[in-house]
Swiss-Prot record:
PANTHER family: GLUTAMATE--CYSTEINE LIGASE
Phylogenetic placement of the source organism: Bacteria, Pseudomonadati, Pseudomonadota, Gammaproteobacteria, Enterobacterales
Enzyme Commission number(s) from the entry: 6.3.2.2
Name of the protein: Glutamate--cysteine ligase
Keyword Transferase: no
Presence of keyword Ligase: yes
Amino acid sequence: MIPDVSHALTWLEAHPKALKGIRRGIERETLRVTADGHLASTGHPESLGAALTHQWITTDFAEALLEFITPVDGDIDHLLTFLRDIHRYTARKLGDERMWPLSMPCFIEAEQDIELAKYGSSNIGRFKTLYREGLKNRYGALMQTISGVHYNFSLPLEFWQAWAGVTDEQSGKEEISAGYFRLIRNYYRFGWVIPYLFGASPAICSSFLQGRETALPFERNGKGMCYLPYATSLRLSDLGYTNKSQSNLGITFNDLHTYVDALKRAIQTPSEEYVALGLKDGDRHLQLNTNVLQIENELYAPIRPKRVTRAGESPSDALLRGGIEYIEVRSLDINPFSPIGVDAVQARFLDLFLIWCVLADAPEMSSDELLCTRKNWDRVILEGRKPGQTIGIGCSDSRQPLETVGKALFADLRRVAEVLDGSESASYQQVCDELVASFDDPELTFSARILKVMQEKGIGGVGLELAEHYREMLQNEPLELLTEEQLSAERDASRQRQHELELKDKLSFEEYLALHGGQ
C-alpha cells in the first residue's frame, strides 16, 4: 500500500535538528482581467517595472499573465506575508483591472486575443517571446493561460549530513541528488494526494473547449459551465497543461546522469510534427527550433529537480555542476479561498509530504512505471471524490480504497509533524488533523467546496466576485515587510537592468538565435 517508513520515522525522531532550516519559495501566476472578467488587453503595467528583470513581479506566457516570485525563505509565515505584500502593491497599481482568482481562465473568446509576453528589444528578451510563440504554435495559446502555484523546497545541509553522511554540498552532491530523486519517485507514486486535497478546478467555462474534441463525460449547467461531478483538478488533466508528445521521451528519475541525458536528447531530437510546422513563415519566426523541446523548460512535469543557474548556463548543466539544490512542486491549483492563491495549511502539508517522500523507500522506476503512476493521478484528477474510489498499487491490478491509503499516509505525516513542531508549537499537527478529515468527508476538499459555489453562480460569477473581493481587501491592507520605497526602487532598477541588457547586445537577433536557438 504505502512504504513502511517506521524505521525512518524513528530515526527522524532521534534527529529533530536535521529539519531545522528547511528553505522554501513560492511562484504564483494570475491573469490580469477587466472589471467584467475579460482578459486585459493592456501591456504589462509600467508601474510594475520591467518583467524581464524584476526580482519579484514578472510575466509568464502571456502579457496579461502575472507571475509573483518570492525570495527563498526559512519561515512560512514570513514567506506568505512577503507574497501578500507583492499582491497588495500590485492591486494598487492595476487601475480598474483585477487578478483572476482561479486556475482556469474564463471569458476568452478567441486565442488571438491572447498577447504573448513581451520583454523589450534585447536578444534575451526577444528570445523569451519567440519561445512563447513556439509554445502557442505547438500547443495553442489557451492552454498556456492556465495559472498555478509552484512551491520550491529544499532540506538543510544538516539533514543530508545526518541522513546520508555527506560532509558538504559539493562533495556530497551525488548523495543529495539521489535523496531528491527518491523524493521525486515517491511524489509520482503518491502525489495525487495534492489534487485530492487542494485541486480547485473541477469545472471549466464551456468557452475553454472552443470546439475541441473531448471524451470526458462533462455535465453542463445553464451558466456556461462544464464540470465533472467528482473531479478535483481539470488543470492537471489532458484538457489542461499537459503534453502528450512528451510522454515517450523516456525520462526517468533514478539518477542525475540518466535524467540529464534524456533531457538533453529531447532538446536535440527533431520532432516530425514541429519540422512540419516550420521555423519561419516568411520573415516571421514560428518557434526557436523544431526539436521535441525548444528548451529544457518546455518539459511538462508535476515536479522538477532544480539548481539556480549561472549566467549562460542551462538548467541541466547547472544540475551536472552542483547536483540538485531544490525541488519545484508544480501540482497546486490556485487556491480560490486565499487572496494570494495559496495558504499556510498548504505550505505546511507540502513540507510534511515532501519530507515523507525523502524518508520513504522508493525503488527505481522505469519509464513504463512512470506512465503507470499517471493512472492514479488521472483517477484522482477526474473523479477523486467518487464514493468508493480506489488507488492502484504500482503497475499491478491490485487496488486499495483511496480513503485507506490517504489515512495511512496521514498516520506517518502526523509523526513527521510532531518532530517539526517540537515542544513549542502544534501548527503542523493541526494541519494533519484538519486535512485527514477530507478522506472521511470529500465535501471538505477544495474541489467540492468550490464546485458547490460554481453550480450556484457559474465559474464567471464566482471568479468575478472573488476577484473584486480580493482586490478591495488587498488594496486596503498596509504593506508589512516591504515598503513603497523598496518596491519603487526595484521597479526603477528593473527598468535600468533591462536598458543595460539592450545596450550590451553585440550580435544581431539572427546571430544570437543561431548560437542559442538549438536548431
